Regions:
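Short beta-strand elements of extracellular/lumenal beta-sandwich folds
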Residues: 38-64
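Asp-box/BNR beta-propeller blade signature and adjacent active/binding-site loops
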Residues: 40, 52-54, 82-84, 104-105, ...
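Extended intrinsically disordered, low-complexity coil regions enriched in Ser, Thr, Gly, Ala
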Residues: 54-56, 61-98, 102, 152-177
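Disordered, low-complexity tails and leader-like regions
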Residues: 16, 21, 94-99, 379
Length: 547
């Protein structure tokens, strides 16, 4: 379906015959989150190439029945100017109107790039937006923004709308929609944005729900830039007790400072994974700590051995008070690493407690060869984290993985594969002593070579009464866009197109992590196009339609 709309868009904008692009008002509606705390959120982008038209007078916006109008503070119309005469791109904007990357400029439209034409407060079902904009000869860009009531909007609110008509030079015209109809805009919260708490970037989300229903979100706090280790990076944690609507002040459960007398940028900790021991209620964070390698890229700089002066350390810390406070991190590298390996660390995201009480994290290691060949597997503890074990890897050329327990107790490892194209999947019945390639491996779940999330939801823990696998990633083989949640009702044998929901089609960093907020609602923490770390809540019924 996506290819059809792209073809239509190109045909309408590029074809010199038939329906003329000139003087036609084209409308594009993108599937992106609406952040509750933002002053501006892009709802529609509009493009008008003026050859004869002189003025855009007004636009008429109609909201759908599902829209929570009482929670919308305002709707705005902006003029985005024109485009270079030499541009060959079929763009709908000359630049991003709101930045997700520029610290301090992540909440509102940058006035350097947009002219506010009209603002309607407390909108009704139909809104008339006055433009009265003299058209520049050639391309003209406009966009419509929506602002929610920050304290009243709910995570499960939605916005649906259409640009039903326009007036150009006093004449009524019908806009041409070049994107799919029926886009449902879902609410989100920017848990971490560029510049928050003095950090340039936040990456690598992990998410769990504690036994008390608290959400614990972990991530990299990348102070200087978005670069991977080695850099000045700590593990940050945000805590929510209201299902993700609000988040407490950031904590830093893992931070090594100037350990060993080295600068903070040579003591980075990153790529966190988090799990909750369902039997004890304790929460565990696993992370990699890099030390003694200057500021070179850790993937290529860590070497065989066991000492932190030579090789990266897999460290863990735990909380026994629902994530409020955390123990000092300790290294489990001596228990787990083969001294001949170069890099050994966890799979970022989350771990699990199996039905027999075993704690399991995904892991990965690299050989000390020219290509640093990676392998994914798992580590586990059968004494509530006192000691950890591992066996053999599932497959080579695989890295960031996530583990889930199937309905029969088998463990499934879903792996990022450096060969690209699709996820690798393997299963084990003995905690990784032996592995079996899954029938869907390298075929069922496409990927652009990126981290992904996989969780299992037992039948007695969801309102549908079915054992469900949920998977999220950029549903593409190019770029990191189209963040999608998919569901499988047969232990991952099939992933039906009807059982999925698209959350964000724009480009981002693409990592994600899933959890169940309650028996009806899925929570996702991900690197979106609108904030470094975004949280959304999605009802299961909006994902699964085949039942």
């Amino acid at each position: 379906m996506r290819k059809i709309y792209i073809f239509v868009l190109l045909a309408l904008l590029a074809c010199p015959c038939g329906l003329q692009a000139a003087d036609t008002l084209f409308v594009r509606e993108k599937q992106v989150p609406i952040l509750i705390e933002r002053v501006d959120n892009v709802l529609f982008e509009l493009k008008l190439t003026a050859t004869q038209a002189q003025q855009l007078d007004e636009l008429v916006l109609d909201f759908g029945q599902e829209t929570a109008l009482r929670h919308i503070r305002s709707v705005k119309l902006y003029y985005g100017g024109t485009e270079t005469r030499t541009s060959r791109q079929n763009a709908f904007r000359p630049i991003d109107y709101i930045s997700s990357l520029d610290p301090g400029n992540t909440l509102a439209a940058n006035p350097s790039y947009s002219v506010l034409k009209h603002k309607v407060r407390r909108p009704r079902k139909q809104v008339v937006l006055k433009a009265d904009q003299t058209l520049f000869p050639g391309v003209n860009y406009f966009w419509i923004s929506v602002e929610m009531k920050h304290r009243k909007a709910k995570l499960l609110d939605v916005v649906t709308a259409c640009v039903s008509s326009a007036r150009i030079d006093g004449a009524s015209v019908t806009p041409v929609l070049v994107s799919p109809q029926g886009v449902v805009h879902r609410m989100g919260v920017g848990v971490r944005k560029a510049g928050d708490d003095g950090s340039k970037a936040y990456r690598i989300p992990g998410l769990v729900t504690t036994n008390k229903g608290t959400l614990l979100a972990v991530y990299d706090v990348r102070y200087n830039n978005s670069k991977d280790l080695q850099e000045h990076i700590d593990i940050g944690l945000s805590r929510s007790t209201d299902g993700g609507r609000t988040w407490e002040k950031m904590r830093r459960p893992i931070a090594f400072g100037e350990r060993g007398g080295l600068p903070m940028a040579q003591n980075g900790a990153g790529d966190p994974a988090i799990l909750v021991d369902k039997n004890t209620g304790e929460a565990w964070i696993a992370s990699i700590w890099t030390h003694g390698m200057g500021v070179a890229t850790a993937w290529w700089s860590t070497v065989p051995g066991m000492s932190p002066d030579y090789t990266a350390q897999l460290v863990m810390c735990r909380s026994n008070d629902d994530g409020r406070t955390w123990s000092q991190p300790t290294s489990v590298t001596p228990q787990l690493k083969d001294s001949t390996w170069a890099f050994f660390f966890e799979g970022p995201g989350r771990g699990i407690t199996t039905s027999d009480g075993t704690l399991v994290f995904a892991m990965q290691y690299t050989e000390f060869d020219a290509g640093r060949t990676p392998h994914a597997g798992l580590i586990y503890s059968q004494d509530h984290g006192k000691t950890w074990q591992r066996h053999v890897a599932a497959k080579d050329s695989t890295t960031e993985a996530q583990v889930a327990e199937l309905s029969d107790g088998t463990l499934m490892l879903n792996m990022r594969d450096n060969r690209g194209g699709a996820r690798s999947v393997a299963t084990t019945r003995d905690f990784g002593r032996t592995w079996t390639e899954h029938p869907t491996s390298r075929s069922a779940l496409r990927e652009p070579v990126c981290m992904a999330s996989l969780i299992a939801v037992p039948a007695d823990e969801n309102v549908l009464g079915r054992h469900i696998l949920l998977f999220s990633n950029p549903d593409t083989v190019r770029g990191r866009n189209h963040i999608t949640i998919k569901a499988s009702l047969d232990d991952g044998m099939t992933w039906k197109e009807v059982d999925q929901v698209l959350l964000d089609e724009e480009e981002g960093w693409g990592y994600s992590c899933l959890t169940m907020i309650d028996a009806e609602t899925v929570g996702i923490l991900y690197e979106s196009s609108v904030a470094h770390i975004t949280f959304q809540a999605i009802p299961l019924k909006d994902i699964i339609h085949s039942l």
